[in-house]
Amino acid sequence: MSDKPGMAEIEKFDKSKLKKTETQEKNPLSSKETIEQERQAGES
């Protein structure tokens, strides 16, 4: 009935088969400086 893998299956899982991937921010947050500059540009 359950779709969850059994404990035995989890224990035999080989982490070395996983590939290391570099995480890349798709939408990095602006720095405080950038936000301040944009605010001042918007006010003038």
From Swiss-Prot:
GO CC annotations, alphabetized: cytoplasm; cytoskeleton; cytosol; nucleus
Region (Disordered): 1-44
Keywords in alphabetical order: Actin-binding, Cytoplasm, Cytoskeleton
Organism of derivation: Homo sapiens (Human)
Chief location of this protein within or outside the cell: cytoplasm
Superkingdom classification of source: Eukaryota
InterPro entries in the record: Beta-thymosin (IPR001152), Beta-thymosin_sf (IPR038386)
Protein name: Thymosin beta-4, Y-chromosomal
Pfam families: Thymosin
GO biological process: actin filament organization; regulation of actin polymerization or depolymerization; regulation of cell migration
Family the entry assigns: Belongs to the thymosin beta family.
Coiled coil segments of this chain: none
